[in-house]
Regions:
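Membrane-interface alpha helices of multi-pass inner-membrane proteins
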Residues: 71-103, 117-121, 314-315
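Transmembrane-helix motifs of polytopic, lipid-linked glycan transferases
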Residues: 2-18, 239-243
Length: 333
């Protein structure tokens, strides 16, 4: 269901908001769903797969507000914020940015404020109930089971020290391990290799070595591609993205997307949250790439436009079948 609605919303963004032809919209939609961890997010029951359609829906509705010169209705804000923030608070912040971009003044009216505050209070109540009704009793049962196991087997759990040491090394050095917020930071993992190999690498094109391994268990933080062609493709996508941002620099929709992108990059690359496995968060930001490329296509004409669309189609088809082959092979093995 998430995959179907993600395709529909992405396609409508390209046609309704950017005014692209159907063939061009299909090419960009294919490119989006050829990204490795977009494909995986649609296959795995996790919140990343649910985040994508809600973020795309937010973009679609925001774009329509921009075109009409209207604001989000309070009930729309309440629904969007409840479901986006319910998946992850960072998504809720992105929804708030969309509300702000649509109507910078009206967003501070009491109805608009309540449309965010009330869902937030409801989410807090649900979180508290979940913690005391399910999580805490489960932790107590697990602790009891571990204690019983240790009584029967004195050696039980002694090997965990090696696992903990490995994970501490993989997760990098935090600014302050005792601080509730700063413990999620990472100031030791190199940024440039993270961008090349993980953010713009594994997120889009799977590595053949250490295929789909977990960085918390056995995967190195950085894995290099076997051939230079993968870095060329990675660079081409980045170049098309930058060109698209330039062509869309006068669009309010582009600036909204850039605010989302800047927030994610500040959180992951700057603060270091999840930097060692940043590719698993691809569904939160990678859809901005084909939308930006769509701005470039919209402003081009003639041969240049045809060349860009052809390049996007070729990249999308190649990446789709390349990543799909590895995913299917992994599942079969």
């Amino acid at each position: 269901v998430s995959a179907v609605y993600s395709v529909i919303f992405a396609y409508r963004i390209f046609t309704d908001l950017l005014g692209l032809a159907r063939t061009e919209a299909r090419s960009l939609t294919l490119l989006l769903f050829s990204f490795a961890y977009i494909m995986l997010s649609m296959m795995v029951p996790d919140h990343f797969g649910l985040s994508l359609p809600w973020l795309l829906l937010t973009v679609l509705l925001a774009g329509r507000c921009f075109k009409r010169g209207t604001a989000f209705k309070p009930w729309q804000q309440a629904v969007l914020f409840f479901f986006t923030a319910g998946l992850t608070l960072t998504n809720g912040l992105k929804s708030c940015l969309a509300f702000l971009f649509a109507a910078p003044r009206r967003v501070w009216r009491w109805r608009s404020v309540l449309s965010v505050v009330l869902p937030l209070a409801l989410l807090f109540g649900i979180r508290q109930y979940q913690q005391f009704a399910y999580e805490q009793p489960m932790k107590e049962r697990v602790a009891m089971m571990i204690e019983i196991k240790k009584q029967k087997d004195p050696n039980f759990g002694k090997g965990d020290a090696k696992i903990v040491a490995w994970r501490e090394k993989q997760n990098g050095t935090a600014i302050d391990k005792d601080n509730l917020l700063l413990q999620w930071s990472d100031i030791s993992t190199p940024r440039l290799p993270s961008v090349i190999h993980n953010l713009m690498g594994e997120s889009l094109i799977l590595h053949s070595q250490h295929l789909l391994e977990d960085v918390q268990n056995n995967r190195p933080v950085f894995v290099a591609y076997d051939q230079m062609v993968f870095y060329v493709v990675e660079g081409l996508i980045a170049l098309l993205f930058i060109i698209g941002v330039w062509y869309g620099r006068r669009s309010r929709l582009m600036w909204l997307l850039l605010s989302w992108f800047a927030f994610d990059m500040l959180m992951h690359v700057g603060f270091g949250f999840g930097l060692n496995e940043v590719y698993i968060m691809t569904a939160h930001w990678a859809f901005i790439i084909p939308i930006a490329i769509g701005f470039a296509i919209r402003h081009l004409s003639g041969t240049k436009r045809e060349l860009v669309v052809s390049a996007v189609s070729a990249l999308g088809a190649w990446m789709f079948f390349y990543n799909l082959a590895f995913i299917v092979g992994y599942c079969v093995d």
